[in-house]
């Protein structure tokens, strides 16, 4: 079954919603973003999260010691790197589960995937400025053509919503799908959209 991550959790109301519908993962964004939370806020929210839901911390080119501090404080299950982090940086996170986000714009982007020693790749859209949470999708067919070269679980992100997530799964059959802006209304997580998104994903066995 395709797993689900709801990213950009930042309010107690968001925690109540995800506790009700139980995605597999939630994401706390520690990088500069309109969904950013600090370590202390994330810790309070995480304490109220259902124990069955895994916690992912999203970082962009953050100091490695800060990543470790936040991870221990919030009790993160996974570190998601959404910047220009290289192999040397990732090697310093030995002992942590790491997802590396990559923007797919050409075949060469896919080629470099296999050089990273991580647990999964999160493939996201790119709007030319922002890293993730942009509502922009990527070329699923380009990724599909190169999937056999990656040899790691793929998490599909970027512009997913209740209208296109089924097609994404049909094309890619990813390990997981990651949604943020696609389940928001006026910049806030929308319970009905989260419910429908999760229902549509979970119909795939």
From Swiss-Prot:
GO process terms (BP)? L-tryptophan biosynthetic process
Recorded hits in InterPro entries, A to Z, give: Aldolase_TIM, PRAI_dom, RibuloseP-bd_barrel, TrpF_fam
Catalytically driven reaction(s): N-(5-phospho-beta-D-ribosyl)anthranilate = 1-(2-carboxyphenylamino)-1-deoxy-D-ribulose 5-phosphate
Q: Which pathway does this chain act in?
A: Amino-acid biosynthesis; L-tryptophan biosynthesis; L-tryptophan from chorismate: step 3/5
Indicate the enzyme's highest-level EC class. Answer: isomerase
The chain's coiled-coil residues are: none
Query: Gene3D superfamilies annotated for this entry?
Result: Aldolase class I
Is Lipoprotein one of the keywords? Answer: no
**EC number of the protein:** 5.3.1.24
Record key words, sorted: Amino-acid biosynthesis, Aromatic amino acid biosynthesis, Isomerase, Tryptophan biosynthesis
Q: Name one GO molecular function term.
A: phosphoribosylanthranilate isomerase activity
Q: Which CDD domains would you find in this protein's record? A: PRAI (cd00405)
User: What is an example of a Pfam family matching this protein?
Assistant: PRAI
The family annotation for this protein states: Belongs to the TrpF family.
The name on file for this protein is: N-(5'-phosphoribosyl)anthranilate isomerase
Taxonomic source organism: Clostridium acetobutylicum (strain ATCC 824 / DSM 792 / JCM 1419 / IAM 19013 / LMG 5710 / NBRC 13948 / NRRL B-527 / VKM B-1787 / 2291 / W)
Gene name of the record: trpF
């Amino acid at each position: 079954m395709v797993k689900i991550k709801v990213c950009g959790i930042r309010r107690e109301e968001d925690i109540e919603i995800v506790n009700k519908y139980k995605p597999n993962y939630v994401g706390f964004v520690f990088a500069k973003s309109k969904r950013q939370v600090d370590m202390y806020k994330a810790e309070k929210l995480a304490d109220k999260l259902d124990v069955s839901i895994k916690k992912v911390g999203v970082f962009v080119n953050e100091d490695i010691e800060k990543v470790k501090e936040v991870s221990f404080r919030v009790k993160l299950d996974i570190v998601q790197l959404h910047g220009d982090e290289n192999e040397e940086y990732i090697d310093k996170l030995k002992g942590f589960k790491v997802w590396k986000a990559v923007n797919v714009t050409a075949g060469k982007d896919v080629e470099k995937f296999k050089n990273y020693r991580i647990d999964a790749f999160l493939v996201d859209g790119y709007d030319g400025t922002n890293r993730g949470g942009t509502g922009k999708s990527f070329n699923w067919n380009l990724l599909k053509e190169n999937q056999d070269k990656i040899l790691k679980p793929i998490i599909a992100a970027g512009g997913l919503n209740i209208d296109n997530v089924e097609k994404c799964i049909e094309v890619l059959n990813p390990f997981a799908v990651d949604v943020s802006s696609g389940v928001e209304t006026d910049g806030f997580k929308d319970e009905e959209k989260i419910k429908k998104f999760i229902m549509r994903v979970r119909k795939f066995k």
